[in-house]
Structure formats: structure tokens, C-alpha cells
């Protein structure tokens, strides 16, 4: 039962934003597990779950090594795009993003870490990022995602 419960905990923190032990216990109960807060606390410790800062002074549980790729990475990219995207243009399967001087490499790194399936890579200079998209038909969708991030 413990192994199944802990597997479910890992699944829950991968798929949802769980901020408290109480939320995790409620989610487990909804999945049919009988748990107490003390049991959840022990499981969190045994699974080495960590708390990751979210937006608006919140934090959520995640497994070590996984969080920045998911929500934390998307939050970081959103902040960088909102603050630094000066211009965006595309042609075929290439997107050019302009940033203020010195900010392109940080944003390119954030783009790489969110692992959007349509983006196969980035190349960054001082103030310009080349984003390579596959298939080329996905380019307008990727541009739109960047514009949505820029709007907040």
C-alpha cells in the first residue's frame, strides 16, 4: 500500500500544483487512499520532495530534478519574455526574438528548459535569439505562445 501511495504522490505532484500537505492528503483521499497528515509528511520526507517557489509568493511540491522543466521553467520564461521581448519575427521554421543587450542568452536558456515539443533548438547572441521550429507549420503557433507570454 505504501509503494502504491508514494507512486500516486509522485504522479500527483507531477500533474498538479500542490502547495500544502493538506492539499496532498485531500488529493490522495480523492484517489481512494486513507491517509493522515502525519503519513503524508513521512511520505514527503521519504520521497525527498522539495518545495519550488511559484508565482504570487506561493510554493508547490515537486520531485528533485524535475521542477524547473515544468512549472518553474514556464514561470521563468514568462517573466523573461514579459520583461525582455522587444520584437519577434518569423520565416519558415525560424523565429527571431530581439531582446535588450545582454538578455538573449538567459531567455534562450529558459526557452530550452521548458521543452516545448515544436522547438528543436535555440542559438543566442547578445540581443538576438534564433529559435528553430519543427515542423515549420508550427511556427505561427509558437510565435503566438511567445506573444501570449509577453502579455502575461
Swiss-Prot record:
Keywords: Amino-acid biosynthesis, Arginine biosynthesis, Cytoplasm, DNA-binding, Repressor, Transcription, Transcription regulation. Belongs to the ArgR family. Regulates arginine biosynthesis genes. InterPro entries: Arg_repress, Arg_repress_C, Arg_repress_C_sf, Arg_repress_DNA-bd, WH-like_DNA-bd_sf, WH_DNA-bd_sf. Pfam families: Arg_repressor, Arg_repressor_C. Pathway: Amino-acid biosynthesis; L-arginine biosynthesis [regulation]. One of its GO terms (biological process) is regulation of arginine biosynthetic process. It is found in: Cytoplasm. This is Arginine repressor. HAMAP family: Arg_repressor. NCBIfam families: argR_whole (TIGR01529). Signal peptide: none annotated. One of its GO terms (molecular function) is DNA binding. One of its GO terms (cellular component) is cytoplasm. PANTHER family: ARGININE REPRESSOR (PTHR34471:SF1).
Amino acid at each position: 500500500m505504501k509503494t502504491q501511495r508514494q507512486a500516486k504522490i509522485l504522479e500527483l505532484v507531477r500533474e498538479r500544483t500542490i502547495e500544502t500537505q493538506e492539499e496532498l492528503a485531500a488529493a490522495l483521499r480523492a484517489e481512494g487512499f486513507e491517509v493522515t497528515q502525519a503519513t503524508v509528511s513521512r511520505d514527503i520526507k521519504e520521497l525527498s520532495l522539495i518545495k519550488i517557489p511559484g508565482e504570487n509568493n506561493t510554493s508547490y511540491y515537486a520531485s528533485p530534478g524535475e521542477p524547473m522543466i515544468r512549472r518553474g521553467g514556464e514561470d521563468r520564461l514568462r517573466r523573461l519574455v514579459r520583461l525582455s521581448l522587444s520584437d519577434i519575427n518569423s520565416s519558415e521554421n525560424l523565429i527571431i526574438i530581439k531582446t535588450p543587450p545582454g538578455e538573449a542568452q538567459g531567455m534562450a536558456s529558459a526557452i530550452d528548459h521548458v521543452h516545448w515539443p515544436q522547438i528543436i533548438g535555440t542559438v543566442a547572441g547578445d540581443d538576438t535569439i534564433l529559435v528553430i521550429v519543427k515542423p515549420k507549420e508550427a511556427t505561427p503557433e509558437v510565435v503566438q505562445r511567445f506573444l501570449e507570454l509577453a502579455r502575461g
